[in-house]
Amino acid sequence: MLIRFQRDGGLVAQLKLTLALDTSTLPPDERSEIEDMVASSGFMDLPPVLEGDPKARDAYTFTVTVEDGDRSHTVVVADSAVPDSLRPLISRLTERAKQQRRADSTGQSVP
């Protein structure tokens, strides 16, 4: 499974986060956990756009694309509109993207 993640917006818009994650490269436990999060969120059945409060201009917007075999789906979701079922995956991908950014700045790799 390939997951592409991007977080835009927020108070400091230049702190965009991006991540490309191939779950086949992860340790088995982490791979299962992330793939289970995708499945339990109903990701492939979510609408392509979930809009939040238009007044929340400083809110984050997340773009997540999941490719799994011959299936591919992209969801763009405002922070205020993230369904409860999707929030664990968004949190995990955000943390992973932050780890990757830190590793890139120090020349290390993320396990």
Task: Please state what every model-predicted region is.
Residues 1-111:
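Function-determining sites in protein domains
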